[in-house]
Amino acid sequence: IENKKIDIVILCLGANDMLRGTNPNIIKQNLKQIIERFQEKNITILLAGMISLETFGNKYKKSFDEIYPELARKFRISYLPFLLDGVALNPKLNLRDGKHPNALGVRQISINLEKKLISLLKKD
């Protein structure tokens, strides 16, 4: 990002970390550092959130699910609560692995992002 003209970035990280059971505090700290770097460069951020599966228990899920709204509030950035809304766990919208979206799933993700992005583009 050092020598590039970037106006807006969609930040959505942490899903694979969640699937591996990474400590939510580590995920949050990593996202925080990324957000701070983008804000230092005056780059507008759309934080696209994820929601934890219950694989690692309720305590883990609660901690993970709080990451994205907390960071959005703290840094006053635009926030989409769940990037995969309508896509996650829908076999018709995912590849055989059940975790990654197929072409139709990507289309739904684009729809999920559209209103937030249009709103951000109008601000610039």
Where in this protein do the model-derived segments appear?
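Alpha-helical cap/lid subdomain in secreted, periplasmic
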Residues: I1-D124
